Amino acid sequence: MTVMSLSRDLKDDFHSDTVLSILNEQRIRGILCDVTIIVEDTKFKAHSNVLAASSLYFKNIFWSHTICISSHVLELDDLKAEVFTEILNYIYSSTVVVKRQETVTDLAAAGKKLGISFLEDLTDRNFSNSPGPYVFCITEKGVVKEEKNEKRHEEPAITNGPRITNAFSIIETENSNNMFSPLDLRASFKKVSDSMRTASLCLERTDVCHEAEPVRTLAEHSYAVSSVAEAYRSQPVREHDGSSPGNTGKENCEALAAKPKTCRKPKTFSIPQDSDSATENIPPPPVSNLEVNQERSPQPAAVLTRSKSPNNEGDVHFSREDENQSSDVPGPPAAEVPPLVYNCSCCSKAFDSSTLLSAHMQLHKPTQEPLVCKYCNKQFTTLNRLDRHEQICMRSSHMPIPGGNQRFLENYPTIGQNGGSFTGPEPLLSENRIGEFSSTGSTLPDTDHMVKFVNGQMLYSCVVCKRSYVTLSSLRRHANVHSWRRTYPCHYCNKVFALAEYRTRHEIWHTGERRYQCIFCLETFMTYYILKNHQKSFHAIDHRLSISKKTANGGLKPSVYPYKLYRLLPMKCKRAPYKSYRNSSYENARENSQMNESAPGTYVVQNPHSSELPTLNFQDTVNTLTNSPAIPLETSACQDIPTSANVQNAEGTKWGEEALKMDLDNNFYSTEVSVSSTENAVSSDLRAGDVPVLSLSNSSENAASVISYSGSAPSVIVHSSQFSSVIMHSNAIAAMTSSNHRAFSDPAVSQSLKDDSKPEPDKVGRFASRPKSIKEKKKTTSHTRGEIPEESNYVADPGGSLSKTTNIAEETSKIETYIAKPALPGTSTNSNVAPLCQITVKIGNEAIVKRHILGSKLFYKRGRRPKYQMQEEPLPQGNDPEPSGDSPLGLCQSECMEMSEVFDDASDQDSTDKPWRPYYNYKPKKKSRQLKKMRKVNWRKEHGNRSPSHKCKYPAELDCAVGKAPQDKPFEEEETKEMPKLQCELCDGDKAVGAGNQGRPHRHLTSRPYACELCAKQFQSPSTLKMHMRCHTGEKPYQCKTCGRCFSVQGNLQKHERIHLGLKEFVCQYCNKAFTLNETLKIHERIHTGEKRYHCQFCFQRFLYLSTKRNHEQRHIREHNGKGYACFQCPKICKTAAALGMHQKKHLFKSPSQQEKIGDVCHENSNPLENQHFIGSEDNDQKDNIQTGVENVVL
């Protein structure tokens, strides 16, 4: 008997929709997607099995093994990104959204190509002329439903400040390690609403809440977004009125641009359904009602929460509908759960899942408002292009169009008001977002970075470009690249940069500086890339080795490049002052307003001139300061350095010698003033019966200009706002900084002082034209100390009486000299253009203007201290001859300086203004002193300690430099004198050589006690002899581990191993062909240069290669003798080359005396080729070549 078991099949009608919605969620988030499809410039993440099940084209591609998809990336060339977005939405949601008739044609063509039958049949349907969009979807019965919606009214745009424009995705989760962007912003933000995004991210997750920004916020950060403003306009938010619970429709809706907050609890999301459905009553969080002038957009009438409200501690991540929802609809019974039906509040459409409803709600959103320039009414597709265009367009004469984009003017209200250049807006936080955060009591959003832990180290990653940084401050500084913040303006043009190194790299093209120096040839270049190409072409340096030969800790392997291949020189050109970003009328208006706020009776010096450099004449600026009254100086006890910002601007175009005299008489100098410091007005109090007093204050912005060298008070490098700079030593201003009295100088006395201390124009030009040695500078300063006029020591007390004081700074000052900066090419003191690097050096009471152009010796020497202390003695200037700049002492001491003496501008000392490449200090190699000592010993033996014939040619310089030193010179003084040429005592070769052989190295400095027993050749060490014996014995101890080839010399083995490594480091500079050995490269370069160093011994023909030359010579021999090979050392002729080689070995074993006799015979009589018709072989060069060939055979 058979018993039949009763079975019942249970079918889940919503299973297919649920699976499809989950797959769509995975596609949107980029999780578990195994294929990336590239269409135009957009990347799409998808599942290969879903695509293969929906399209015959993808099925053939993925199932067939004939087409190999590299890295699971497939590129479609014949489709548009917008069309493929609609196709993916149809595959994952079974819905097609049609907005235009052209979209239907494109979808039909794409469906025919991809093998999607539903899309092919779209062309057979009839569409009305209504502009509203159509929706086609497949129901459960297989019937296609069609829906048309009315076009919504346009809503004004809402902007929240500047956008971060960078073509990188910022939605990637922490667990995903894929190289491609998991979210296609261009495809997703158009079709997926914000409610769907926030709901899908926290769907059925009660243990963790991921941080997810809405698509509206994410769309701001990508170039792929076709319209950023649509994301703002397309996110309506409802605000229900608590007093009227029934009105949950269109009247009480307001749009708020709010950002969801991070949380640690699951997020409750809203599911729209019919208004008759019962919902739970969820109290909303307190949100301030902000008035936003926007039109209201429809929302679903009622909601049903699928997850209970969390009662645990912690913040709750609410969606935007939940935050603003306040409905008092009674809840359903606890025992009965109604079926989930999702109805649209705008139409009678019903859906089975929230995903389908969210895709449907995209149809009810308003269309995109066109982006129009407010100046020229030109339309653009992206906001980024519009912003760039408006920056250019606003500088022209176009007036803003009344109907233009008011959004741009609301965020950037200062653009175009003052007529200045655009410096870039600051990142603004909109008022609605500030109110939201302030009302909820939370802090400002901090989502500009992510924190990762790698090997126990915390790294901060940028959310835009995924770069990692060790410190948060470095990440904040890097964030300026992605924002509109531009805080580093160029000193020469109107460009503003986000980072200081960008500005430094840009200013090189203005100054023409060559800061990158090659360590091989010491040649300098403007950029690192030019330097790299130079080293690749001329020095055969392959910079790719520094990438492939990295060690574990990030450095280079010592075997590849043990040193850095360049050094970055410091900046030598002084930066020009900032150009004013405001017009003169606006700046004067601000200064006048600050003048009215100051105390009455204030004397203010203004700048009526512009900040640009005018045309100057150095010779016509002598009588300016002498005709003007002296400006007294007021110092404060708490201020070390009194500065003046506007006095030099009031003097106008005068500079040069007047500024120097101002330093001499009043200890008055000026500083370089930035644009921000012009707002500070300089004021002073007026007292009855006194002249107007100018009070000068040292603000905190000028702290970077103070650089302490030595002494009690810091030395100050202050820079003029236009041209010259003044360097004052610390002790020279000690009396001025320690005094609390007001210094008043008589105009008559100051005028007489200027006439007495005025330097002659030719002397100033001579100082500026050539560098001065240290001896000359110290001689000048010692003379200056002896001739200080007494009138310069008169100062005035507050009562007005003059009193004579002693200058303490002159008695106790330590004289130092600072090296000036080199001028730009083409500038001089006699031209009409002021040199940018002119610096006044304050030494004692005399100012010396000096320009020192570096470049001849870039590795500076360090001067030695003399054994005897130099005693300075004042000498009369008239009797002291002017030392010549070509003297050996001057040339020797002019370059003896330390690198610490070369300083940059005060603006270069900014800690944020780092160079583009790191700075490395290279210590030059020390020269060997062995040869120098031997030459000194031999010279002393021959000539004694002092030779009467070698007298000092410049006695005045030596007396000034050494002072009252003892008669016997120290060892350092003798070292500077030029030593005579020594003659070799071992041979007579140097006595008989002519002028052409003076550069040849000498070979008899050391003895050679080790001689070879076979060839009698002498060597200096036994190791060299042992290596030489391998030529006779045939020993080859060095074997290649790769191919087994043996070598007698280890250097030949190392050259051979390069062949197996495949390293071709030597590149031809003409054809960029790479070679393994440097010798091979040199031989190859002869093809390009045409150098033929091998010439025939019998004729005047020259050859590139040695083998070609030997073959040519053998032809001469065969033509002369008819047959056989001739020996070059004797008249014997051999029949074969092997016999000639055996014969030549006999000459190797003869005694040296016999070889000399045979050599004399060969040179005089025994050469058969010379005795006959070969006239060309009689030259001395050809005989030397024959001897060279014999020596090569011997070796």
Swiss-Prot record:
It holds the Pfam family BTB. Transcriptional regulator with bimodal DNA-binding specificity. Binds with a higher affinity to methylated CpG dinucleotides in the consensus sequence 5'-CGCG-3' but can also bind to E-box elements (5'-CACGTG-3'). Can also bind specifically to a single methyl-CpG pair. Represses transcription in a methyl-CpG-dependent manner. Plays an important role in regulating DNA replication and common fragile sites (CFS) stability in a RBBP6- and MCM10-dependent manner; represses expression of MCM10 which plays an important role in DNA-replication. Acts as a transcriptional activator. GO terms for molecular function: DNA-binding transcription factor activity; DNA-binding transcription factor activity, RNA polymerase II-specific; methyl-CpG binding; protein homodimerization activity; RNA polymerase II cis-regulatory region sequence-specific DNA binding; zinc ion binding. CDD domains: BTB_POZ_ZBTB38_CIBZ (cd18223). This is Zinc finger and BTB domain-containing protein 38. The keyword Secreted does not apply. It comes from Homo sapiens (Human). The keyword Repeat applies. The modification Phosphoserine is found at residues 130, 309.
